[in-house]
Amino acid sequence: SVTVTPNNVNIPCNGCTTLTATVQGSVATTSYSVAPTAYTPYSFTGGTPILVNIDDTWSGVITLPFCFQFYGQTYTQCVIGSNAIVSFDLANANMYNTWPISAAIPTNTVGDMMNCIMGPWHDIDPGVAGSISWAIYGTAPCRAFVVSWNVVPMFSCNNLKLFRY
């Protein structure tokens, strides 16, 4: 079973566990619509490798080939964290990707959590196995910037119960 306390999540390494999440609140917008789509994932392999064999760090700055609108802001660059997080705060580039999370979420005070898209954002360890890469799929105006954390094990759970996002 998964054990959750205010500052810790313990996931067992001896079998499969299904994780679900409930999103609380959102920012209203007049320009986005949400609709269900069929599950057709992009490739988990290929792309441009980053953070090869490095745990708990942010990538260098990655320039997007298009403008990305996120909560009313326009971004053209990002950084990717080894713990399944993408940030538009370029001050994080090549820095420590904070773990553990010591602040409540949501927060307006912790830099790692500002202006970011979180996968599950948890402590995974690409220093042991797996890969992190990014790629652009599609053609304008329907392009996608895709980041893959492929078969990366959980930190301190190196028997390779793997994570793919």
PLM feature spans:
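Proline- and Ser/Thr-rich low-complexity, intrinsically disordered segments
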Residues: S1-S43
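Von Willebrand factor type D
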Residues: A28-Y165
